């Protein structure tokens, strides 16, 4: 289904029978998506340069295989790459490829992702192989700057723009039980 609220290309639910020859992937766990009423929680496998056949078009796109999203959707980044004409009287859709590009490669590698939750700056997503921090860990300072209500959004942005958190001096309270 078309989902203009999903900013990615193509998403499909995880199924153990799925098998792709593409090893260009990124495995993430945590709360990657926010819906209108909640946050998701699960594992996401993001593939780049996946060959896709869409009608008569052979393309490459990013594909997300998700344990948290249970629908097969095409998102706005994919939708914008086509001109759509919907004929409601005859129940037909006509599609023409336009000049808008379809993202097929990762623009950056995500190791971790932070979000302000309940007035705390928490790690909500991590790349599966990362072991330095855990989901739910609270970040209390960044580069010796204490996280406060006044700067938490600014520090969240800094963290989420930084590909390698090893380049930052972080003080973290572990959530491990």
PLM ranges: what are they?
Residues 1-177:
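Pepsin/retropepsin-fold aspartyl endopeptidases
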């Amino acid at each position: 289904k078309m989902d203009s609220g999903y900013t990615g290309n193509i998403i499909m639910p995880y199924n153990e029978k799925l098998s792709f020859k593409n090893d260009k992937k990124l495995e993430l766990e945590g709360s990657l998506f926010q819906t209108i009423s909640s946050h998701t929680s699960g594992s996401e496998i993001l593939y780049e340069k996946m060959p896709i056949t869409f009608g008569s078009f052979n393309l490459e796109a990013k594909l997300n295989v998700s344990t948290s999203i249970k629908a097969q959707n095409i998102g706005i980044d994919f939708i914008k790459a086509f001109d759509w004409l919907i004929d409601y009287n005859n129940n037909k859709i006509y599609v023409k490829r336009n000049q808008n590009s379809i993202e097929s490669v990762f623009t950056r590698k995500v190791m971790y992702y932070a979000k302000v939750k309940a007035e705390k700056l928490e790690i909500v997503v991590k790349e599966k192989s990362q072991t330095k921090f855990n989901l739910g860990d609270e970040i209390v300072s960044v580069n010796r700057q204490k996280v406060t209500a006044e700067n938490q959004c600014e520090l969240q942005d800094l963290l989420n723009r930084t590909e390698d958190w090893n380049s930052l001096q972080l003080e973290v309270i572990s959530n491990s039980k």
